[in-house]
Amino acid sequence: MTVETDQETMLTHYITCALWSSMDNADESGGDPLDQNYGPDDLHPDTRAAMLADCSAFLASFESEIGGLLEQAGHDLWLTRNGHGSGFWDCGRPWSKDAAKKMTDAAHALGESDLYIGDDGLLHV
């Protein structure tokens, strides 16, 4: 695989997790998960670019720890950076304790990132 392919694979799963774990806030209860009404094509181009930059930088920093587990890394990066109660450190994950700690710390350093529906109908961070 190429670096670009690896980045896109990780990004695809990062976006999938973001849509699955984010709500549309359409009502007082939080509404529906975004993935029920939105998909990757609904991301604003700047949002996709920002997500790709985050995934690419993370992958470059932890390529040896991630290995071929790009799908899991994308998923865990979104969950961990946003404090969803699961992520790199969670039991049953394929990472060593040391790698999980390093990746968790790096994900937290990125800060939280929330998707929202803009006035243009597209998803933004």
Q: What is each residue range found by the language model?
A:
Residues 1-68:
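Long, contiguous N-terminal structural blocks used for assembly/anchoring
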Residues 122-125:
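C-terminal edge-of-domain segments
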Residues 53-120:
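Amphipathic protein-protein interaction modules
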